[in-house]
Amino acid sequence: MADRKEQKRVNAEKRQENWVDRLVSVNRVSKVVKGGRRFSFNTVVVVGNEDGLVGTGLGKANEVSSAISKGADDAKKNVIRVPMRDGTIPHKVVGKQDAGKVLLKPASPGTGVIAGGGVRAVLECAGYRNVLTKSLGTSNPHNQVKATINALAETEDALEVARRRDIPLEKVFNG
């Protein structure tokens, strides 16, 4: 499985794409020091080109704006290519990250992206137009985003399945 994920990774620095970035969450954290509390921020950011490339990143800094830019830079380093068929995913898949599970199902044209929060951000940045989702488990946005990325990394196009099984493409659908 690790080989497939590495195979899908795309070197974002070589590609000069028009990235769309979405801020999923901003979290203020505090550290208690001798003089009181010291606040810092962490952000979860999703970037994509709305054409099959998507990545997620976590940024931490003392100011919100620098945490967002660090998160976007981190997301561009973790970009994967995801398969798409008629604006939806090729098949039903469940992604897991810690206590978070996300179920993704293909949808017919005109349905739209039925998702909430971080899951919607990932799917829209990837370029999906019709997907049904269900978040099972945690409501933590960071784990939801990572579970969605894991689910998308597990999806396979029909051509990949045909090549792997060494059968013609028609046999994939007709058995």
Curated annotation (Swiss-Prot):
Record InterPro entries: Ribosomal_Su5_D2-typ_SF, Ribosomal_uS5, Ribosomal_uS5_bac-type, Ribosomal_uS5_C, Ribosomal_uS5_N, Ribosomal_uS5_N_CS, Ribsml_uS5_D2-typ_fold_subgr
GO cellular component: small ribosomal subunit
Keyword annotations: Ribonucleoprotein, Ribosomal protein, RNA-binding, rRNA-binding
GO biological process, one term: translation
Domain (S5 DRBM) ranges: 19-82
Any one GO molecular-function label of the UniProt entry: structural constituent of ribosome
Family in the record: Belongs to the universal ribosomal protein uS5 family.
Domain remark from Swiss-Prot or TrEMBL: The N-terminal domain interacts with the head of the 30S subunit; the C-terminal domain interacts with the body and contacts protein S4. The interaction surface between S4 and S5 is involved in control of translational fidelity.
Record text on subunit structure and interactions: Part of the 30S ribosomal subunit. Contacts proteins S4 and S8.
Functional summary from the UniProt entry: With S4 and S12 plays an important role in translational accuracy. Located at the back of the 30S subunit body where it stabilizes the conformation of the head with respect to the body.
Protein name from the UniProt record: Small ribosomal subunit protein uS5
Species in which this protein is naturally found: Salinibacter ruber (strain DSM 13855 / M31)
Organism lineage: Bacteria, Pseudomonadati, Rhodothermota, Rhodothermia, Rhodothermales
